[in-house]
Amino acid sequence: MIKESELILNPDGSIYHINLRPEQVADTIILVGDPNRVPRVSAYFDNIEFSTQKREFCTHTGSYKGKRLTVISTGIGPDNIDIVINELDALVNIDLHTRQPKEQLTSLNIVRFGTSGSLQADIPVDSFVLSSHGLGMDNMFHSYKDSPKVREIAMEEAFIAHTSWNPLKGRPYIIACGQELKKRLLTDKVFEGITGTAPGFYGPQGRVLRLPVQDPDLNDKLHSFNHNGHRMTNLEMETSAIYGLSKLLGHQAVSLNAIIANSPTGTFTKDTKKVVEDLIVYGLEQLAK
C-alpha cells in the first residue's frame, strides 16, 4: 500500500495538485504551459464535459471530432512536469481506494503544445518543431533510479564533450520521444530535432540582465551540436522532463512547439496568437485522425 504521505488525495478523492479523479481524464492528454491557453484549446472541442483549476493546473476534458481529450496546464519548468506526469499516471495506474498499482496498466498519449525559440536560422518564426529528443539541462530526472534505462547515453556523452559541460551544473540527460505517437504528429509541415530543456529562463538560456552567465558561448554550442544527424532545433523548459517520466512510466509523449523567436536571425513573430492557434488546430487535427 502506498502511504498517504506519498499519494496525497483531496477530501473529494481527487489527486492533490491537479485536482482530478480518474474518470475525469482522457487517455489522450494535451499539455500546455499557460492556464489561459487551456480554454484556447478547448474552444475547438465539440463539448466540454468537465473543468477544474487548482493553482496553475487548469484542466478541461471533452471531445474533438469524437476523440475524447484532456487539456491541462502545467505551469513552467521540469519541477511542475514532475507533479503533473506523476499525478496523471497515478490516476490511471494506481487504484486510489486500495492505494495499490493496478495489474493492468494504461499507456497515455501525452502531447505538449508549446512555444519556443529556434536555434537554427533555417527554422523560421511561425513554423512548428516536433521534438525527436528532449535534452534536459536540469537535474530532476536523476532523482529516479531507473533513469539510465531510457536515456540516450552515447548522445549525452557527445553533448558533454561538445559543450565542455561544467559538471557543477549536473549531467545533461537525453530522452527520445514516443515513436508511435510521433508517427501521428510528424508531417512535412513540421521540422524535427532535439529540444533543449533549460531549468530557468534567464541564465540557463544564456540571457544576461545584471548577472554574468557561467558559459556565455552555450547557445552557440547548442546551435552547432549534431549527433548522427540529430541537431538542436529549439530551447524551452519542459520537454525532456515530459519525455523522461513518460518513458519510465510506459506512456507515449511528443512535444510540438510553435516557433515564436529565432536566435540566429534575431527575429520574433509578429503574431504570437496566430501561430499558437495554428499549432493548436494542427495538433488537434492530427490527434483526431
Residues of each region from the PLM?
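Metabolite-binding pocket within alpha/beta catalytic cores that recognizes anionic/polar moieties
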Residues: 1-173
